[in-house]
Amino acid sequence: MNRQSSEKLKKTCAWFIHLIASMCGTGLLGLFVTNVTLYRQIKICGNREGMSGWVQINNNCYTMVENITFDELIGHCTKHDSIIPNALDQSEVLIVSSVLGVKDHWMPFTKKSRNWFHGKLPVNIKGDGDKREELGKPRKPDKSEKCTIYYDNGIIEENCNKKHTGICFSPFF
């Protein structure tokens, strides 16, 4: 190979290296822009304020909190911009309970002046005596039982100061 051929080969190789480097740079810039654009569109349940374990179910986000009283659960959910799930939708309760693997958990029903409410909405709660006995409770609820838990496809009256599993809910964003 003569000297001119060797110089031409060097220039061609240098040109190819510059071409590849510029293509890689352009490609990486394109990936970065795409990633930033998609990140703004992706809706994440994610970790909120240090609270991990959020799960997306039917376009909503849920997380489980173990060993908590009813009042503690309300405060905990509020702190994380969430609420106790709407228990008026039984299909929601069944899906969330099975996905999170929760057997019993707090429901958002409370007793005031001998009537049951979901917030300010009156609801009809009839606890299941058989399920109460399964939990070692008397068939009839005690007057101090002013909260409810969901247990084995039923609702049971419970003392608000007892500790159970709780579930927090937040819309998917």
Curated annotation (Swiss-Prot):
Superkingdom of origin: Viruses
Protein name: Putative C-type lectin protein FPV198
Native source organism of the sequence: Fowlpox virus (strain NVSL) (FPV)
Keyword line: Lectin
Domain C-type lectin: 50-169
Keyword Transit peptide: no
GO molecular function, one term: carbohydrate binding
